[in-house]
Amino acid sequence: MGDVIVLYAAPGMGHIVSMVELGKLIVHRYGPHKFSITILYTCGSVVDTTSIPAYIRRISHSHPSISFCQFPRVTNKITPNISGAAIMFDFIRQNDPHVRRALQEISKSAAVRAFVIDLFCTSALPIGKEFNIPTYYFHTSGAAVLAAFLYFPKIDEQTTDSFKDLRDTVFEFPGWKSPLKAIHMVEPVLDRNDPAYSDMIYFCSHLPKSNGIVVNTFEELEPPTILQAIAGGLCVPDGPTPPVYYVGPLIDEEKELSNDAAAAEEEDCLSWLDKQPRRSVLFLCFGSRGSFPAVQLKEIANGLEASGQRFLWVVKKPPVEEKTKQVHGVDDFDLEAVLPEGFLERTADRGMVVKSWAPQVVVLKKESVGGFVTHCGWNSVLEAVVAGVPMIAWPLYAEQQMNRNVLVTDMEMAIGVEQRDEEDGFVNAEEVERRVRELMESEGGRLLRERCKKMGEMALAALGETGSSTRNLVNFVSSIT
């Protein structure tokens, strides 16, 4: 079987796709004669969707040098009053015996050159070390969040209170231009009494114990102060910082539709975009899981209508619980029932609303698209960057508030919406209209668009033969051979 690199994906479609893209990058650069890729993934998580098996079959067929190892099903224990993050960390720990067994089996027929684990799979780090396999992290967000995670054990020492109670108290991270409000920390650390808090401390403190960290970003995108803070050891003041390899942007260009109805809707929205003037359409999409209650959807609709701008808006079914910002899967629903009465008719000449899904990578590359309202999930950010499209930053969950901070203040790639500093992060119609007009009509929006266009060119150059990301990939491979 030869040399193999084993990748271990955290639960969920997005994490699996990111690992596949890393595997494809390695195989594309070095060919299957150099390395084969085996991707380990779990079964039984609450975030599993029916699209995962079909996706894996498709990748297995189109990329024969990438194979998959699905673990036996583990029951995701749902415990009342425990956060989803804590439940997920526990689920990943329950899979540790399967990780050990998989590495044992693979090692019988191949030389495992590296074991690359998702950040959230930290419990597998000592297993890789146990087999004397160089073990690396794959960080699927940007350098700013990596800097924050590396430094978080020091932040933990600064207070004994929960960040959710500290609210507007600000904390400084090495290299960041502006501090972060306590309430905007990543969700798993907001409540010190939740088990997820200690899980996060554990994984942040173990990042430096790896052989290195592979990051889905590129050097030119990142603020130099943040790159210097990481490289200079400011984020890990009490010990050595492992090598960091910025190899992005890794983007899934092969997303496939789930059914014929989705295919027809895709064709309709792309055809509509082709008929619109250049850079005139605002695209609104909040990720595969981002969802709003009906009251927020109505505010967005009223803001869009008042702005007078053209728009393509992806609307997902509102969550059952009003405060929830995530949905899993794609359920059908009555679109007109969740929007203001008559909205679709009044905006039909300049707007299009689609249910649940649109081909985001393709949409962002359309000439007619001039702006993107995003939840600041890192994959979506990179897709916009590559397409050269400026953003309106509207974070919902996970590390997205951190991404928003850096996109707006440090990178100057986005305009931020003002959200109510409550759990729901509510945005009113007037703020929606204001930010839409600012991006699509103002001189500041035009300058932002020019900046984003240049960054898109840099993204492509980073992956070129002499680009920074190619150089970093070569350095990573050199470290394991």
Swiss-Prot record:
It holds the Pfam family UDPGT. Keywords: Glycosyltransferase, Transferase. Coiled coil: none annotated. The keyword Glycoprotein does not apply. UDP-alpha-D-glucose binds at residues 288, 357-358, 375-383, 397-400. Gene3D superfamilies: Glycogen Phosphorylase B. Its EC number is 2.4.1.-. Belongs to the UDP-glycosyltransferase family. Glycosyltransferase that may possess chalcone and dihydrochalcone 2'-O-glucosyltransferase activity. This is UDP-glycosyltransferase 88F3. The gene is UGT88F3.
